[in-house]
Amino acid sequence: MRGKKRIGLLFLLIAVVVGGGGFLMAQKALHKTSDTAFCLSCHSMSKPFEEYQGTVHFSNQKGIRAECADCHIPKSGMDYLFAKLKASKDIYHEFVSGKIDSDDKFEAHRQEMAETVWKELKATDSATCRSCHSFDAMDIASQSESAQKMHNKAQKGGETCIDCHKGIAHFPPEIKMDDNAAHELESQAATSVTNGAHIYPFKTSRIGELATVNPGTDLTVVDASGKQPIVLLQGYQMQGSENTLYLAAGQRLALATLSEEGIKALTVNGEWQADEYGNQWRQASLQGALTDPALADRKLLWQYAEKLDDTYCAGCHAPIAADHYTVNAWPSIAKGMGARTSMSENELDILTRYFQYNAKDITEKQ
């Protein structure tokens, strides 16, 4: 009996030693396959590594570096193991399928890969980001005005890091919107109009030789009998910039640019009045034949603008509500962000006007 017990204890000891050794070896293997050197042993990772080298996560004044695992592998037990298991597909694609073994293939799959990572981070409330960054540790008052606004908004709205910080360590995918959306907008242009109707250009248009009218501008039809409707454009002139008509005094949302003939043809509807900054404004209007098709409902143009926002802007950050900024602030903000996308000038102009017409200081949303 004693012999059997000793044999049993011996087997138990061997099992403990083998199990413990196996556990330690597994831990060692998991740790070793999580370091940056292992990640870079795959040829396909050389491209994202070069992108990462140009970011503050690689080099900064604090001397703190975020390695691959810091961003891509959660620290907690099961999430950690699941991440390691899912990463096995990368080894398969590297050595078997060759899915991203060239620059062209990598770019073709960049959006798919990026969206996979964004989805994982969203699902974990950006857990790997929060292992270094937390709202509790932030001195928000010392941040830039824009960062303060966005971080306060994120805290109140329950947003997570990846909502706004896409493309923080690697280039974001270059997303383009299908041309069908623009063609559909053109197909919805009003085919007939009546006197008193309101119509809205969906692209830069002309009122004869008098003015160039911007997308979204409200035009009132005063004579629909001819081939080209005669429209009324109403706005505000600013002293020193008389060749532009704006939406309202003090609000620099340009409705149209006037030619010399257009300035002469203006009907002035009031005296010059100063705004709070001393700029002089007066009401004015212009009538003429609209030479281009227009929409009968401006909401169609704004729906197109929202698609532009979802396609080009949401790839880098969470949607920013139009009423987050003022009508005068939006142009420079949209221009700065739009420069990082592949939007055309016309697309950026439409999106900017959508933001302006629905800005926080526009009392009646357009």
Swiss-Prot record:
In this UniProt entry, which residues form the Cytoplasmic topological domain(s)? 1-6
Q: Which UniProt keywords apply?
A: Cell inner membrane, Cell membrane, Electron transport, Heme, Iron, Membrane, Metal-binding, Transmembrane, Transmembrane helix, Transport
Biological role? Part of the anaerobic respiratory chain of trimethylamine-N-oxide reductase TorZ. Required for electron transfer to the TorZ terminal enzyme.
Residues binding heme 2, per UniProt: C68, C71, H72
Gene Ontology MF terms in the entry: electron transfer activity; heme binding; iron ion binding
This protein's membrane topology, according to the annotation, is: Single-pass type II membrane protein
* Any one cellular-component term (Gene Ontology): plasma membrane
Q: Where do the annotations place heme 3 binding?
A: C129, C132, H133
- Tell me where in or outside the cell this protein is found: Cell inner membrane
Binding-site residues, heme 4: C161, C164, H165
Q: What are the transmembrane regions?
A: 7-27
Protein modification: Binds 5 heme groups per subunit.
PROSITE patterns registered for this protein in UniProt? MULTIHEME_CYTC
For the ligand (heme 5), the binding residues are: C313, C316, H317
Which biological processes are named by the entry's GO terms?
A: anaerobic respiration
Q: Which amino acids does the record list as binding heme 1?
A: C39, C42, H43
Disulfide links within the chain:
none
Q: Which family does it belong to?
A: Belongs to the TorC/TorY family.
Question: What is the official name of this protein in its record?
Answer: Cytochrome c-type protein TorY
Q: Which ranges make up the Periplasmic topological domains here?
A: 28-366
